[in-house]
Curated annotation (Swiss-Prot):
Glycosylation sites noted in the Swiss-Prot or TrEMBL record: N205, N272, N281, N389, N431
EC identifiers of the protein: 1.-.-.-
Domain FAD-binding PCMH-type: 59-241
This protein's pathway: Pigment biosynthesis
EC class: oxidoreductase
Cofactor(s) the record lists: FAD
Record protein name field: FAD-linked oxidoreductase chry5
Keywords attached to this entry: FAD, Flavoprotein, Glycoprotein, Oxidoreductase, Signal
Short name of one Pfam family: FAD_binding_4
Gene3D superfamilies assigned to the protein according to its UniProt record, in alphabetical order: 3.30.465.10, 3.40.462.20
Family: Belongs to the oxygen-dependent FAD-linked oxidoreductase family.
Signal peptide from the UniProt entry: 1-17
Species of the source: Gibberella zeae (strain ATCC MYA-4620 / CBS 123657 / FGSC 9075 / NRRL 31084 / PH-1)
Classification via SUPFAM superfamilies: FAD-binding/transporter-associated domain-like
Length: 506
């Protein structure tokens, strides 16, 4: 799905009982001596440790012996980049010397099962590496590695600026960008990663490097960046916020209309991959018992830039299908997250102990028959008192003009030609392995049905939503040249595979 508060990769907690699993030959407290006075180290059994290592999804979570927190000055003071990045650097060196696994964590919303391969290691918690500094000429912004998307959005907005960020407020800015990164403004400017001008990154050898378009690593960092280091800051393009107003419309239908609804989206919204730049279309499948107690509904969401009411050319065809409920709002760009339910206060941003595996797939357009088949299967498994009744399927239909304007070979992100990002999300409180296996079965089946409807051989997967069993060809593109280039760069920059817990290249 979508999500903010910091940035990097991911990690999690261990209980008091797991303290017995610690490597007895490692003096973890020695790490404190390696850091500045304002840095922090958290140990199991403390509230700080529990809070810092808590995850959005508890399925196949990593286990952590210690949490190290790089220091910064407080958020209202200009952050000294050299100091904060040096702290991260020392932690990497400590882990290297002790031969310990480590993960950098942002908001901990990564749900990929490969994270569970991180055992008894160090979490580098980036929440203090948070800050936004706009350049004097207003054309770029430097963002520290642990900065939340909301902080970036609001900091720029107050200065009359914008850049492409993730949609969900509780997700970090950098983390999604390392996998490409979708956002509201991508129709105008491209992916989040397309905004990068340079970045500072701690590499596997413990050195801090400044990387830009002149580095061979630049290509890989924009799409497969989780595999190459810890980003401590990034400088990105900014744009004047010339158009401030947005309009929103939601139309909710009984599931029996699913086939007609997606035919309508194909005809009036997608338009064979030419969706208007100022228009965004999402849709959800989920339970709203007050509207339909018999099963999940289909909710169509339309967001349009530069108007106070969504054009009837887009809402009219849906109105003709007689929705159960309709809502309309007007506001500004910063209202979008609230309208679609992904603010820091909304459900997708809460860490409540649930399992939240996702099973993403990209689509060119909708196969209405496949949509109906997938919906019916999903509905049969989440309706009523099912343990999975809090699950949903999301369909993100951003404008893609800005994404497609960039050469597909210029970055490691492989799916610029795709128009729809689908994110089946099985959300539940696990009561055992059998339940986890059933959730996996449901999620995979929904994806399989949609994939069969495309007639394609390969399954294109958004790496930031990945379940974990797909593989490099699905995450990073099946072309042989892409796989070869990534493997060569991995061998050159991380031959020991130190950054291989999130969707590893090899």
């Amino acid at each position: 799905m979508h999500l903010q508060a910091l940035t990097g990769l991911a990690t999690l907690a261990v209980t008091a009982a797991s303290q017995t699993l610690w490597s007895r030959d490692v003096d973890y407290k020695a790490l404190s001596k390696e850091l500045s006075a304002s840095a922090k180290v958290y140990f199991p059994g403390t509230e700080d440790f529990d809070a810092a290592s808590k995850r959005w999804s508890n399925l196949d979570k990593p286990t952590v012996n210690i949490v190290a927190v790089p220091a910064t000055e407080n958020d209202v003071v200009e952050i000294t980049l050299d100091l904060t990045q040096a702290n991260t650097l020392r932690q990497v060196k400590f882990a290297n010397k002790k031969n310990l696994p480590f993960l950098a964590q942002n908001s901990a919303h990564g749900a990929i099962t490969t994270l569970g391969q991180m055992k008894q290691g160090i979490e580098i918690y980036l929440n203090q590496l948070s800050g936004v500094k706009i350049a004097k000429d207003g054309k770029s912004v430097t963002i520290l590695g642990g900065t939340a998307s909301k902080k970036v959005t609001m900091g720029l907005w107050e200065a009359g600026k914008q850049t492409v960020t993730g949609c969900c407020e509780c997700v970090g800015y950098v983390g999604p960008a390392l996998g490409g990164g979708h956002g509201w403004l991508q129709g105008r400017h491209g992916l989040i990663a397309d905004q990068f001008e340079s970045m500072n990154i701690v590499l596997a050898n413990g050195t801090l490097a400044t990387v830009d378009e002149n580095s061979e690593l630049w290509w890989a960092l924009k799409g497969a960046g989780h595999n190459f280091g810890i980003v401590t800051s990034v400088t990105s393009k900014t744009y004047d916020a010339k158009i401030k107003n947005w309009a929103f419309a939601s139309l909710t239908f009984k599931g029996e209309k699913v086939e007609e609804l997606y035919e309508t989206i194909n005809k009036y919204i997608l338009k064979n991959g030419t969706q208007p730049t100022d228009l965004i279309n999402w849709s959800y499948w989920f339970n709203i018992p007050d509207l339909d107690p018999t099963g999940p509904i289909v909710q169509i969401l339309l967001m349009q830039e530069g108007v106070d009411v969504v054009d009837k050319a887009y809402t009219g065809p849906f109105q003709e299908l007689k929705p159960l409920a309709v809502d309309a709002k007007k506001g500004v760009y910063t209202d979008l997250a609230k309208w679609v339910g992904v603010t820091t206060e909304d459900g997708p941003c809460q860490k409540n102990g649930a399992m939240n595996p996702r099973f993403p797939i990209y689509l060119q357009d909708y196969n209405p028959a496949a949509q109906k088949k997938a919906f019916n299967y999903f509905a049969d498994n989440i309706r009523g008192d099912s343990i999975f009744n809090g699950s949903l399927v999301t369909f993100d239909g951003y404008s893609t003009e800005g994404v497609k304007a960039i050469d597909s070979k210029s970055t490691a992100f492989a799916y610029r030609n795709q128009n729809i990002l689908v994110g089946p999300l099985l959300s539940y409180q696990s009561n055992g392995t059998a339940t986890d296996e059933k959730a996996s079965e449901i999620g995979h089946k929904v994806r399989d049905i949609l994939h069969e409807g495309t007639g394609r051989d390969t399954v294109p997967v958004y790496v930031n939503y990945a379940f974990g069993d797909e593989g490099p060809k699905e995450w990073y593109g099946s072309e042989a040249w892409r796989q070869s280039r990534l493997q060569e760069l991995k061998e050159a920059y991380d031959p020991k595979g130190m950054f291989s817990f999130y969707a590893p290249i090899a």
